[in-house]
């Protein structure tokens, strides 16, 4: 990188406001997952928009969670979690767990995954994991899970997508990704 470009980058770094950061990153679509776990007999869940594949060998996935998240420490203490990929017809489910109005589990059908974490068969897919590592990253933690089981629920639904503060779904292909 040329010195003038580097200087420009360093000068501009301090100009990034949380609002600008959120606006620009809001232009990037993300999937919506419901990361679940257990605390004794109590099912727990948190809505995640940062779920990502990390490694195929070993099979690792990850997500970011805010340092102020109240549910995550209870899920982490159990040593496992299940990432349920929400379908485009599950906006109400995402909102129920996001807003925490009433009991979000009421009317939500689930079965125990291999780890015991709640697996939601109405979702597009579920990825059951043991906690592999947790790294602090600014005001978030990056959670890495080792996949112990996974399930394509073959619901025929499309995954729920979040973009610019709104939910949507994945449209027809505009080209091959291969």
PLM segments and residue spans:
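Basic, polyanion-binding surface patches
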Residues: 2-178
């Amino acid at each position: 990188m040329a010195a003038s470009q580097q200087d420009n980058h360093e000068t501009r770094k301090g100009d990034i406001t949380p609002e600008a950061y959120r606006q620009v990153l809001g232009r990037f679509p993300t999937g919506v997952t419901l990361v679940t776990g257990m605390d004794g007999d109590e099912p727990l869940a948190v809505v995640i928009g940062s779920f990502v594949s990390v490694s195929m060998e070993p099979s690792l996935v990850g997500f970011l969670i805010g340092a102020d998240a109240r549910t995550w420490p209870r899920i982490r203490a159990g040593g496992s979690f299940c990432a349920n990929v929400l379908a485009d017809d599950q906006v109400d489910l995402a909102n129920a767990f996001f807003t925490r109005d009433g009991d979000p589990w009421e009317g939500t059908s689930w079965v125990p995954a291999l780890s015991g974490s709640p697996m939601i068969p109405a979702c597009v897919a579920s990825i059951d994991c043991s906690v592999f590592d947790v790294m602090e990253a600014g005001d978030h933690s990056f959670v890495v899970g080792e996949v112990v089981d996974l399930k394509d629920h073959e619901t025929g639904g499309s995954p729920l997508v979040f973009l610019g503060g709104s939910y949507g779904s994945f449209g027809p292909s505009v080209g091959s990704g291969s």
